Design a protein with these regions (language model features):
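A short, well-structured juxtamembrane/interface segment
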Residues: 2-25, 33
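Conserved short-loop catalytic and cofactor-binding motifs
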Residues: 4, 55, 76, 114, ...
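Active-site phosphate/pyrophosphate-handling residues
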Residues: 14, 33-36, 125-128
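Short acidic/polar alpha-helix capping motifs at helix-coil junctions
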Residues: 5, 32-33, 50-53, 90-92, ...
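A conditional alpha-helix N-cap/helix-loop micro-motif detector
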Residues: 6-10, 60, 78-81, 119-120, ...
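Non-catalytic C-terminal accessory region of glycerolipid acyltransferases
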Residues: 19-22, 44, 48, 82-193
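Catalytic core of membrane glycerolipid acyltransferases/transacylases, capturing the structured
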Residues: 23-82, 108-111
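Exposed alpha-helical structural elements
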Residues: 12-18, 62, 66, 87
């Protein structure tokens, strides 16, 4: 923690601190700012809840093992999007905060929807897991304050109604994504389609 506190400030921590210890949360993450610092979130937040994330394994297993080890060195736990979904759900049930990068093109596995008016494929996973486990979705942003300094902001939690389905819930989260991507456009690293 001491290694990064001089380059990173935290904002609106109450939005994550107020999540009950026994309840998990979905952290809606973006490729923005210094996004690799998200793997150090476990060291940064005062909650006792474990922090983990879904990740896409790299094709080269040697490089993948090295990168995964580096990312998990801060105490976060990573779950492969190909084989780790069951473990990720158990993690969430035990009160874990599960980070999911929501801004990647999801291909055939994604939900076809409009993003900034253009047809796109978005992962429905944050919506599916939030609905299934009735846990909040907390958007997390990394804004560049100056060269080499960032602010990690925990936005207001979104509690999805159990009366809506994954399609409606994903559309709702896409609106949140659009707002964040518009607000923080200089920090977003986003190449879709």
């Amino acid at each position: 923690h001491r290694n990064i506190e001089h380059i990173l400030t935290l904002a609106d921590l109450q939005n994550i601190e107020n999540v009950p210890k026994e309840q998990g949360a979905i952290l809606l993450l973006f490729h923005m700012g210094n996004w690799e610092i998200l793997t150090k979130m476990h060291e940064l937040i005062p909650n006792e809840n474990p922090v983990g994330g879904m990740y896409r394994p790299l094709k080269n297993p040697l490089i993948d093992n090295h990168v995964k080890k580096q990312r998990e060195s801060g105490g976060s736990q990573l779950f492969s999007r190909k084989r780790g979904l069951i473990m990720a759900q158990k993690f969430l049930k035990k009160g874990g905060f599960l980070g999911i990068l929501c801004d990647q093109y999801s291909g055939r596995a994604g939900l076809k929807t409009k993003l900034f008016g253009a047809e796109s494929s978005i992962t429905p996973l944050p919506a599916i897991l939030a609905l299934k486990h009735q846990c909040p979705v907390i958007p997390v942003t990394l804004e560049t304050l100056s060269p080499g300094r960032w602010e990690m902001r925990f936005h207001k939690p979104i509690q999805l109604s159990p009366q809506i389905d994954k399609v409606e819930a994903t559309h709702l989260l896409v609106k949140v994504m659009e707002n964040i991507m518009h607000t923080y456009s200089r920090d977003i690293f986003w190449l879709h389609d």
